[in-house]
Each structure stands twice: as C-alpha cells, then as structure tokens.
From Swiss-Prot:
Annotated positions binding Mg(2+) 1: 44, 46, 86
Active site: 44, 46
Free-text comment on the cofactor: Mn(2+) works as well as Mg(2+), Co(2+), Ni(2+) and Zn(2+) work less well. Bind 2 Mg(2+) per subunit.
Enzyme class, UniProt record, top EC level: transferase
InterPro entries named among the record's database cross-references: NT_sf, Polbeta, TA_antitoxin_MntA
GO terms for MF: ATP binding; metal ion binding; nucleotidyltransferase activity
PANTHER family in alphabetical order: NUCLEOTIDYLTRANSFERASE
Residues annotated as binding Mg(2+) 2: 44, 46
Function statement: Antitoxin component of a type VII toxin-antitoxin (TA) system. Upon cloning in E.coli neutralizes the effect of cognate toxin HepT. Neutralization is mostly due to di-AMPylation of toxin by this enzyme. Successively di-AMPylates HepT on 'Tyr-109'. In vitro will use ATP, dATP, GTP, dGTP, TTP or UTP to generate a mono-modified protein, but requires a purine nucleotide for the second modification reaction (ATP, dATP or GTP).
Lineage of source species: Bacteria, Bacillati, Cyanobacteriota, Cyanophyceae, Nostocales
Similarity comment: Belongs to the MntA antitoxin family.
Claim: Metal-binding is one of the keywords in the record: yes
KW Nucleotidyltransferase (keyword) present: yes
Protein name: Protein adenylyltransferase MntA
C-alpha cells in the first residue's frame, strides 16, 4: 500500500475501474472522517455502497463470497490498506446511517448520474426525526440495562 493519501478527485478517477470487479455497483460514497476532513493517524475509510439488487442477486449466485471481497477490491484499486476499510450497504443500513451518508458523503461513483440526489431526497431526515430516533435508541438501551439489573 502507499503512504500517500489519495484525494477525493483521485478516488473519483480510480473508482471508474470498479465496475469491472463490482458490476452491480450503482453508487460509491466516501463518508465519515475522511469525507468531512476530520482525520487523524487512526482514521479508517468509510465507504457506502448502493447495489443494483437484481444484478447483485444474480452475481452472488455464482460468487457467494462476493460481498466479503469488496474491501479488498477497494483497497487494491485505491491503494489503501483494506484492513482500514469499512463498508456500509445502503440497501440494508439504518435510517440514521443513511442520513449521515446523504448529509456528509462525497460521491466517488454513481450510475446514473443523479443517483446520489435521489438517495438524498429519500433518506435525509429532519432534526425532529433524528431526535426521535435518538430518543428511541436511548430508551431501548435503558430498557435493556434495566432488564439486566444494571
């Protein structure tokens, strides 16, 4: 792997090579600290992927381990350590994670060209919705702790 950290522009250019190895990819987004610029020596690489479900399901039939090799493919093409890569599948993630990807993410690849705009329109939450989700999560944690006598 290289010592040089690739720029967003370099990642966008390199991402065009992904389709040969991930033919069901519709969108790739960098999010988290690398997208916001709040990085440190231990920062990982958070990527969100959106797949064409039909193509993905057909591909998985012949390549059952395909989902597990995505970090390796991204690491190889972007020349970054695959152990530092986290993948979120936007087809199956929580509303809150999808919101943060839509709010803070940097699109590296999308097909068709307005996929990220459509995604943002679908998943961006209002402050009221975020507070409601956070309240529900806190209540769930409190209930769990009470059941365990903590």
């Amino acid at each position: 792997m290289q010592d040089k950290i690739p720029t967003i522009a370099e990642l966008r250019e390199l991402s065009l090579r992904l389709l040969t190895k991930i033919p069901y990819l519709k969108m790739l987004v960098l999010f988290g600290s690398r997208a916001t610029g709040n990085i440190n020596a231990n920062s990982d690489w958070d990527f969100a992927v959106l797949y064409d479900e039909e193509k993905y399901n057909l591909y998985i039939q012949n390549n059952p381990l395909a989902a597990f090799v995505i970090p390796g493919i991204l690491g190889e093409i972007f020349k970054i350590n695959s152990d530092k890569i986290d993948i979120v599948e936007l087809n199956h993630c929580s509303k809150l994670i999808a919101h943060f990807v839509a709010r803070d993410g940097k699109v590296l690849y999308e097909e068709p060209g307005d996929e990220f705009d459509k995604f943002q329109q679908r998943v961006l939450l209002s402050n009221t919705e975020i507070k409601k989700i956070e309240k529900t999560k806190l209540e769930n944690i409190e209930n769990f702790l009470q059941r365990w006598g903590v």
